[in-house]
Amino acid sequence: MFEIEAILLGGQDKLEDWIKQEGAPHKALLQIGEKKMIDYILESLRNTPQIKRIVLTGDREIYKDYIEKVDLFIDDTHNFVDNLIKISEKAELPYSVFVPIDVPLITSEIYEKTFSYCEEFCPDCYLYVLVNNKKDVEEKFPGTKRTYWRLKGGYYKMGNIFLIRKELYPKAIEYGKILFESRKSATKLASLFPLWFIFKAALHIATLRDCEKVVVDKIKLNGRAVPIPYPEIAVDVDKKDDLDFVRKILT
């Protein structure tokens, strides 16, 4: 069984108007029934057998009531790469799963089954990119609007959590710096991908294996795109409609 530490990403670049209108100082503290959104996430992580440690990153003042509820708190630097460096320096277990602060639908059962499936799917991988099929998501959650990539064989969405082995941190930091430096230039971003992939993606004939190859060629370590039959992993709370949607399910 994988031994995993959960990295709960609690940063927030700005407080959006719809969150202010809910009377919350942060997305994590949005009320869903009798609990805050972060409570659902922490409860699920705590009850997942493979997760042995929970690390929370964010603003200390926002999370003052939660610092004692996690194993380690890391102050947010407001820079993705710098945060990743700090997290890597504190990593203890063989695997880390990165979890955003806005995925309250993922239950401990889903986490457990997902990690077990990843272990069976590729026991020696360094990176597991979870992928949801549009058909699965819309069958279970009709009406929810997600962004999908059109690939050969269907429409797919990258899941909101991803799993890595501890040894991948240096490569993740290196590649994260490249992405950060290129983020405002379409030309620079395009240069990160081989021409064959750009061509296939434009024609919607790229496959999941093609996507894997691009990533593996960059990190020089084994990684897989893992098709997951759990639509909850695809649903995050990015807008008021999403909040209303998860409230209907959880309350």
Predicted regions and their residues:
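Conserved active-site beta-strand element of glycosyltransferases/polysaccharide synthases
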Residues: 224-227, 236
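N-terminal nucleotide-binding beta1-loop-alpha1 segment
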Residues: 1-24
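Short, conserved phosphate/pyrophosphate- and ester-handling motifs at nucleotide-, phospho-/glycolipid
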Residues: 239
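Short beta-strand-to-loop acidic/aromatic patch adjacent to the donor-nucleotide binding site
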Residues: 94-104
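Short catalytic helix/loop segments, enriched in acidic residues and glycine
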Residues: 22-41
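Conserved N-terminal catalytic core of the sugar/cofactor nucleotidyltransferase
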Residues: 3-4, 8, 35-95, 108, ...
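Conserved core of the sugar-phosphate nucleotidyltransferase
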Residues: 108-217, 228-232
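Short amphipathic alpha-helices within nucleic acid-binding modules
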Residues: 243-248
